[in-house]
């Protein structure tokens, strides 16, 4: 009984543990929103499809929360007929927490509902993500520490207003008018709240006046208050009330040119829905609307213009119709749904990191901390959060840009990430008075200043003021004239000019044997980069020289002469003025025909392309991000300088100096640039791999390029650094540069771009690449954005400059150590091969003497045995065969012979045609064994030749004839080129005669050899008799038949 009870308890515990494990794989997300989509831009029909889209993307792609299932629950926070309900939101939050155990909340949207639920989730330590709730109060993280806002924040709007005031020098006062019914969600109150509080925080006096159109607010009283309190006006309320205010403003006769009126219209209903003319939405009979609205500006949220947002918008509307039967029209309100989508992705990323670190899925404190100071690309563009978990929002500033038609255009936008206003280069504010109005004009709000008295200034005062003004005008004029004269003097002085005679091409101190450095040069003439020719890529020595004792890089210009126009002089002056750590320093230019060249700073480490293509250099990601950061810094400075753009940015134009700092070269001096490639040359297309699509349509695009074109080129360089597979690498496709350029130029969707591989680099880097090489130049980020983005990616790069430099030096030293070790091993291997070759050419003892540098002396030997052989009938066989067949025959035969003689103590002296000569005891001094070794070798060769097959004549038998003789010789090395080990003496001649007087397939030997072999007693010899030898007379000779099998050999 006890055993059964124990088993039951164990089984129950197992089931409970298993159930708890399965539950842990589920993530429950509660979405709480109102239902009325006509009233709320964050209602269920608008937002829930976006959240479901994010949910589906996460579950399908599997990159985030792999193995987890996300369950979405939805609850309404709206009371029937009453709009947003704070109590309903509280009840739904508590019930959900008790019965459904959620891991996160999304919504509710309404400010008061978010505030009440936010206090609960703060206590439960669960995250609450919303894309609305703009109230200033949520900045308090002591009370709302787990709230994350991925949409509009009134604080961010206030910061934009503050930057506007700083730009226009409005530092004293402002006036605010906002609509407030004090019921429901009070959207206009909370939107204007941030502007009021931020300006007040900056010591600007702000008079705020609420109004309620349902209580017949007196607009004339508002106008009276406005006249007494401000000239910089902010109005936040329904469009019809704003236009009514402007009608009264006009009727009261206020001069609009003295005011700057900003209408806070977050969703641009006054602009986008009204043909870009705000006043056309009402039936008001305007006297002169264009004159009136010249001083009216509209501040809206900035609509994302990336392709992902457009696709998201289309799918959002389709899902709203399918799931809620609601027909949505495209509007700026869709950005709220997009921000909820990005908020869901932000939560998924933070949760994924928490789980990967072993954390809990309901640890809201840790999860929300991971959402702080984060940056990634979402459907609404760059998503950047601050330390308060509020998203950095961008805003547009609209103004009347066409004073004839009255149409509005965007004159600036506020970059919330960079905290700066970016002014349009084409659309400008046209102030009625030519300059912004004053926020605190003299003698209007205060009469305390002395000059506000109606009495006229005394004569002395008038004289003093006039004299002062005259002195100021004289001083300004003198300064301008001085600057003009100084500029002309600099242009005429030509401080940049270098005479050809001043350049030296040998070291003044003769320290270096050559002035070249192992860099690469481009076909266009750059001192750096890989030389790409029609036949491939080659590394050459860059042209370098010495100027005033310093080593410099010299780039020759393919022009007959340079016309020194004023434009060229200004280009040269600007080049001389540019000084930055990440740009190569311009030293000067030589314009003496035909030696026209540009002289720049010399960087000894080579180009970035060289480093990437050198597989022996190991680049970790800290080093790579450091190189990327150097490029971004250099290009950001260049784009903000007089030069403006590069026009030919590529990896070969990024060079590394001795301190491993990357610098950009070959910029500026557009007048010096020329092209010498043939129109259809391989090099021309290879050079265009970095060129943006919009510039490829030109046969010769502007030499100075464009800033957006430089961003595209930077994207290609990013891919080079990330994959190290060369420029414009496309996985699985082997295309020529011409084919690649033509595909990019065609511009057909899907756009042809290089391969990204998130297994080799981060997903954020892939997003940055794709953003940089976007087809539409307007979609590409500026280098100011890229700089911040890269700094965010390069978390390790936040260390000091010294630590970064030391890290680079350490990595380079490690690379050098590995390279030295590899080169040493390669050297030893080549040395071994050379020694083996030497041992094959010369005897071992002679080779050792030569290696030691000793002179090889001729040497006499008392007794050696020499072997000669040739092939009987070889001449006729050669006549009947092709030369290639003869070579093949001899190679096969001698390869076979060489393998056999390795088994004997012999040395092959030479082969001449079919003749084969071998000697024994010329170096080893093996007593009388030399005769035995040659005899044994001869028998082995004769046996092998009987089975040898001729490839082209397989039925023919090779007939080998062998001759052997023993006697004294003299040996030595003859010659310096191709030295040969030669034997001299009558023994050599006699051995040759023994072979020539022998018979096929027999071994013919002399009596001298026979006497030595008899001492061994196991060779079978047969007397041939006396044979007449040329020059020798008659000699008694013998046949070697084989070895005796019945004799025991010791």
Curated annotation (Swiss-Prot):
Residue intervals of the Protein kinase domain: 517-790
Native source organism of the sequence: Anguilla japonica
InterPro entries according to UniProt: A/G_cyclase (IPR001054), A/G_cyclase_CS (IPR018297), ANF_lig-bd_rcpt (IPR001828), ANPR/GUC (IPR001170), Cyclic_nucleotide_synthase (IPR050401), Kinase-like_dom_sf (IPR011009), Nucleotide_cyclase (IPR029787), Peripla_BP_I (IPR028082)
Cytoplasmic membrane side: 482-1050
Signal peptide interval: 1-19
Induction notes from the record: By osmotic stress; levels decrease under saline conditions.
Protein name according to UniProt: Atrial natriuretic peptide receptor 2
Function description: Receptor for the C-type natriuretic peptide NPPC/CNP hormone. Has guanylate cyclase activity upon binding of its ligand. May play a role in the regulation of skeletal growth.
GO CC, one annotated term: plasma membrane
